[in-house]
């Protein structure tokens, strides 16, 4: 098969992440606007006014744009749902990602392409056949193993199950990122404890906290493996992507709309490279080891295989927050870029920066640019280190803009089990 037969879908929660996804080689991006998406109140979101700009940027770079409209929708939400889908249609959004039949039906009625959300928990071919009348792409339940995915794929081909476009239904699966302890994300813990519904895009992620389990009758604290008994490790499938492709997965969805642009670029690049390696027949252990090492540098809670390989049940994180091998520390803001000589000027606002440091520069147009500092100049003179208050210049491989943020990447010691 060819690269064009597969799709890497990157998460976008900001213009910085949008540009980072493009830099990473994404084939498509998915995002939300205010209301009716599963990150509507738990992360940054765009507005309806951003739709045309996002679609235009995607069009300029030849990638598809998918808008999430996948929360539980109540009667009072129907006017807003129609308004959002109308705006998506008018702006030229490639497809909406929906979980409610009301949204699917309305989108179909106005000619807006639909993809099915994992919230539907589609676990068998009969359910897929029912929903095929609405959608051309389906995200199967995250709890399936690859044998079950392959059986559904075989039935799609055998029965010629097609969507509204008249083409065979394409299978999409989550490939990387955060996992929820609940089946297909249908969790009520946040609503119960914080009056903020995960099914309405307002998850407070209290499952990520440390807990102890107490037996009220005996007053004995139960022995559990670690305190983070409801916080799963992150999904990582890059080491068996070849098996996912062979099983019939065609769209690889990367989770992370609430994560930074450097994460988006890193993860997108690695999975895009994996697709290319598979198609060129060079997918091997050496490359897998390289991708693994790079991915450990991005935000993660430790990694496991999900349910795909059917080898074991959930694995739980052993700490709060990220287990990344590197962290970013803000040090400077962008001033000017001299395109003729490929030099960027910054002003130090915190800490220090030395020759040999790894840096990350982010911005709404710049995206996420990472490199090593080869030389620093202050007042045109080379120095080994620059500190707060100084203006300095460095060679940059890509253009930066005024007010871009420069971070120094620092190594982090992590617990062995997170690896």
Predicted segments, located by residue:
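Surface-exposed amphipathic alpha-helical tracts and adjacent flexible/coil segments at the periphery
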Residues: 1-24, 28-40, 52-55, 61-71, ...
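Charged helix-capping and loop-helix junction motifs
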Residues: 44-50, 79-84
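Short, glycine/polar-rich helix-capping loops at beta-to-alpha or helix-loop-helix junctions
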Residues: 123-128
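Well-ordered mid-protein domain cores that form the structural environment of catalytic cofactors
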Residues: 81-117
């Amino acid at each position: 098969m060819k690269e064009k037969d597969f799709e890497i879908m990157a998460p976008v929660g900001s213009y910085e992440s949008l540009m980072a996804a493009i830099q990473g080689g994404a084939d498509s991006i998915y995002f939300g606007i205010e209301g009716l998406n599963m990150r509507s109140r738990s992360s940054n979101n765009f507005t309806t006014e951003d739709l045309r700009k996002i679609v235009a940027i995607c069009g300029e770079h030849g990638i598809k744009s998918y808008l999430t409209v996948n929360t539980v929708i109540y009667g009072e939400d129907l006017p807003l749902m129609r308004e959002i889908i109308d705006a998506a249609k008018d702006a030229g959004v490639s497809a909406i990602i929906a979980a409610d039949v009301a949204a699917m039906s309305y989108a179909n009625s106005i000619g807006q392409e639909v993809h099915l959300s994992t919230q539907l928990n589609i676990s068998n071919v009969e359910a897929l056949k029912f929903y095929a009348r609405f959608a051309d792409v389906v995200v199967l339940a995250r709890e399936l193993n690859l044998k079950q995915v392959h059986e559904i794929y075989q039935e799609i081909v055998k029965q010629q199950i097609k969507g509204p476009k008249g083409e065979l239904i394409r299978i999409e699966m989550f490939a990387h990122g955060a996992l929820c302890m609940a089946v297909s994300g249908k969790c009520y813990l946040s609503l119960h404890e914080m009056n903020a519904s995960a099914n309405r895009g307002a998850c407070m992620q209290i499952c990520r906290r440390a807990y102890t389990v107490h037996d009220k009758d005996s007053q004995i604290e139960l022995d559990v493996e670690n305190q983070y008994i409801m916080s799963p490790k992150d999904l990582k499938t890059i080491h068996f992507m070849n098996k996912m492709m062979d099983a019939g997965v065609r769209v690889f969805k990367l989770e992370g709309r609430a994560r930074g642009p450097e994460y988006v670029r890193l993860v997108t690049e690695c999975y895009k490279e994996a697709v290319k390696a598979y198609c060129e027949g060079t997918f091997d252990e050496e490359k897998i080891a390289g991708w693994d090492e790079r991915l450990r540098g991005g935000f993660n809670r430790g990694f496991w295989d999900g349910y795909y390989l059917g080898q074991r049940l959930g694995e739980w994180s052993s700490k709060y927050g990220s287990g990344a091998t590197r962290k970013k520390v803000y040090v400077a803001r962008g001033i000017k870029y001299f395109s003729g000589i490929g030099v960027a000027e910054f002003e130090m606002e915190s800490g220090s920066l030395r020759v040999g440091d790894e840096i990350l520069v982010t911005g709404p147009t710049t995206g996420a640019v990472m490199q090593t500092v080869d030389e620093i100049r202050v007042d045109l003179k080379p120095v080994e280190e620059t500190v707060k208050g100084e203006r300095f210049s460095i060679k940059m491989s890509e253009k930066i803009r005024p007010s871009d943020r420069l971070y120094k990447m620092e190594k982090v010691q992590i617990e062995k089990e997170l690896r």
